[in-house]
Curated annotation (Swiss-Prot):
Gene3D superfamilies referenced in this protein's UniProt entry, alphabetically: Helix-loop-helix DNA-binding domain (4.10.280.10)
Region of interest called Disordered, as start-end residue ranges on this chain: 119-158, 173-228
Family matches, as SMART domains: HLH
Gene: UNE10
Source taxonomy: Eukaryota, Viridiplantae, Streptophyta, Embryophyta, Tracheophyta
Tissue-by-tissue expression: Mainly expressed in stems, leaves, seedlings, fruits and flowers, and, to a lower extent, in roots.
GO CC term (a single one): nucleus
Free-text function comment from the UniProt entry: Transcription factor binding to G-box elements (5'-CACGTG-3') in target genes promoters, particularly in far-red light but barely in the dark. Required during the fertilization of ovules by pollen. Repressor of phytochrome A-mediated far-red light responses including seed germination, suppression of hypocotyl elongation, and randomization of hypocotyl growth orientation. Does not inhibit phyB-induced red light responses.
Name of the featured protein: Transcription factor UNE10
Up-regulation conditions: By cold treatment. Down-regulated by jasmonic acid (MJ). Accumulates in far-red light more than in darkness and red light; this profile requires COP1-triggered protein degradation in darkness, phyA inhibition of COP1 in far-red light, and phyB-mediated protein degradation in red light. Follows a free-running robust circadian rhythm, with higher levels during the dark.
Amino acid sequence: MSQCVPNCHIDDTPAAATTTVRSTTAADIPILDYEVAELTWENGQLGLHGLGPPRVTASSTKYSTGAGGTLESIVDQATRLPNPKPTDELVPWFHHRSSRAAMAMDALVPCSNLVHEQQSKPGGVGSTRVGSCSDGRTMGGGKRARVAPEWSGGGSQRLTMDTYDVGFTSTSMGSHDNTIDDHDSVCHSRPQMEDEEEKKAGGKSSVSTKRSRAAAIHNQSERKRRDKINQRMKTLQKLVPNSSKTDKASMLDEVIEYLKQLQAQVSMMSRMNMPSMMLPMAMQQQQQLQMSLMSNPMGLGMGMGMPGLGLLDLNSMNRAAASAPNIHANMMPNPFLPMNCPSWDASSNDSRFQSPLIPDPMSAFLACSTQPTTMEAYSRMATLYQQMQQQLPPPSNPK
């Protein structure tokens, strides 16, 4: 059995194969449908006679495909060709089965872009052209070759098949040259597009994450700075006595006033030269006695036979202290003012040696200093200091 199958060349442009069916004048021999035939020589020619029951033809399903009945229709069309007039050909049934198989194998199953073109040529019964699975464009450029005649039909129909060496190009639906739209390409598939979108979203999310992280670090540093400021303000509020302000501006105003008053007090103490205020009570009393003895040399007794030595009248000193109740205990008398120290001489007049006590404004100032340290006390001390500065006489310039 000889079958004609078109050759497939990958690099060539596909071309359609044509099949030309030509009838001959061979005589139709109905004995071909029998299983057993008898050869006889009649009148110088070879004849066939069928023996036995007729043969039942079965349809071949070897080359059938699921193309919706297209291949079956082509095979059926080829088998139902009209029988031509009988001719005197010898043994016309040798290639009876191979003709149908050749036509079945030579047919290409069409796809979506199918082009059916039926052409009839003079001298042939039917010619069928079947399109390939590519576009609807016309295919050409193949090599044409003639195939040896074959017998088909009921008996004496001879088929002459003109074939082309068809080249089929293996096309990839995912290549960029064969795709018209990007959405039809396999390369631009949905998972790949989703991956690209995820990459873009990942880049945006990384930028937003960096910004949020920087903002969080900035907020944390600002929070620490505010906590430090609040802690310093609380410590400063504790240093200011009787401070009841809560807002920062009022607290700072109180601190400023307090510092001004402290500065006035320090300047007053430095001008008056009062280091004894920093000494304990016993040392202050001892210093008072020493200064009183040194400042009043006339109070020394001379009539007791002890020249250069004298004793202090403690009773008179106590009476003088009792006669001046307005003087504070911490008050040190002015060392330049003589104390009331009468001598042991009874004939002497006490009035000559008694010096009147000069009221000192520092007593009131020091009395205020013993009170609890408040803003009013500091303001009162500052006022007294100003009055003292006004009452002091201007110093005389020696010539």
